[in-house]
Regions:
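Extracytoplasmic gate region of multi-pass secondary transporters
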Residues: 30-31, 219-259
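Helix-to-loop junctions at the C-terminal end of transmembrane segments
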Residues: 62-74, 269-281, 366
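Cytoplasmic helix-loop-helix junction between adjacent transmembrane helices
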Residues: 105-143
Length: 402
């Protein structure tokens, strides 16, 4: 096996761009393009939620697969196949003008995105020193915002009213962003897994000082908090363009440009943990950002003006990405890299199950009772805040017992 001569910071680019594709382009930008497909009469408005649920069904399948993979080499192979699947699916989606073909491609795209989101971050973090882990995690996960922003701005400028052109924009971005990610995966195939002695020692010390059952309970609470965040964001991801056009009266182009604020929020949400001193613990950070997310969701629900809508979308983007970044980092503090990958995959699996149930249940309400969808989203985020407060208190007990 070869040893890599590149600095570990190069790995973060491949990780960041992979997340940009899997989260930003595949998931976050679908609300924009789904609305354009409905305008083009490829699908009905109600089908946006249905396709999102199908996408998450594929996502769920991929998450379950990644969570059960024990071999590092197998995980890398799955992520490579997933990247190729995503590229092919997005290219073909721009040429599929009916619901059945879109359903198949959304399913495949979701499967691929799951393997990238679940398996890629830990691969990109393998060579990162422990003291840089939270910063590096933030940089990688900010890719979700970069992808969302690039997609929203690209569609807004080049294809504000054309579904085929919008898909072409996403396909071009996907191909370009995939190059560093595929290079990272090729490199990882040639390298042995680094021994994370510092992380292992830290984890063993934590478990010895704070019994294993309580650690497992803490991990479960963190996973459920992340899952509730994924459920709570659905009204914004799927129905922001619909609300912006029908409730506030914006044009489709303005709605797409407003959605770019979500991407900016995602980028900032990924970067904030990278610059905030470690004295602000990850467990406390999770509770604080859950409160920000709840404020953003409430503001989104009562928005009747462009300014309040813009602020709410930005806050929700920050909350979304910070929750993902901090959850991944916190899991890494509690367990080794392999267990972290599987715990992270489990978190995304449960979130995907909730996303499927929520989006499929609410798809019929989109046209006539969107306020009920918003209320359900706010309820989910309120539950997340309660869980994050609880996990912080449990983490504080852990620290006191050391």
């Amino acid at each position: 096996m070869k040893a890599s001569r590149t600095h570990w910071s190069i790995d973060l680019i491949g990780g960041c761009f992979g997340i940009a594709i899997a989260l930003g382009l595949v998931r976050f930008d679908f609300g924009i393009i789904g609305n354009l497909m409905a305008d083009a009469q490829w699908i009905d408005v109600e089908d946006i939620g249905t396709l999102a649920a199908i996408n998450m069904l594929g996502y769920l399948t991929g998450c379950i697969q990644q969570a059960t993979v024990k071999s590092r080499a197998t995980s890398i192979r799955y992520v490579q196949i997933a990247m190729i699947t995503i590229i092919a699916s997005i290219v073909l989606e721009g040429r599929s003008t009916n619901l059945p073909s879109q359903s198949v491609l959304r399913l495949l795209c979701g499967w691929g995105a799951a393997h990238v989101v679940s398996g890629l971050p830990t691969l990109a973090l393998e060579r990162v020193p422990q003291r840089w882990r939270r910063k590096a995690t933030g940089l990688i996960m900010s890719g979700g915002g970069i992808g969302s922003l690039l997609g929203a701005v690209g569609i807004g400028f080049f294809a504000p009213t054309s579904a085929p052109s919008a898909w072409n924009v996403l396909a071009t971005l996907t191909v370009v962003l995939s190059l560093p990610t595929l290079a990272l995966l090729r490199q990882r195939k040639q390298l042995t897994a680094p021994a994370s002695e510092t992380l292992a020692n830290s984890t063993n010390q934590t478990i010895s000082n704070f019994n294993k059952s309580k650690i497992n309970k803490l991990i479960l609470i963190i996973i459920l908090g992340f899952a509730l965040m994924q459920i709570g964001q659905i009204p914004v991801i799927l129905y922001e363009p619909l609300i912006a056009v029908n409730k506030i009266g914006l044009t489709p182009m303005m709605a797409s440009n407003i959605d770019s604020l979500f991407g900016i929020g995602l980028i900032i949400g990924g970067l904030i943990p990278s610059i905030v001193p470690s004295k602000l613990t990850t467990s406390l950070f999770l509770a604080v950002i859950a409160a920000v997310g709840l404020a953003g969701m409430i503001l989104f629900g009562i928005s009747n003006h462009l300014i309040t809508l813009s602020i709410s979308i930005f806050l929700i983007g920050v909350w979304d990405m910070m929750t993902g970044t901090l959850t991944l980092d916190r899991l890494g503090q509690l367990c080794n890299e392999d267990t972290q990958r599987r715990a992270w995959s489990t978190a995304t699996t449960i979130g995907a199950m909730g996303f499927i149930a929520f989006s499929s249940t609410t798809s019929q309400l989109a046209q006539h009772n969107v306020n009920l969808i918003l209320a359900m989203g706010i309820t989910a985020v309120s539950a997340q805040l309660i869980l994050e407060i609880f996990q912080h208190r449990l983490s504080a007990k852990q620290q006191n017992s050391r």
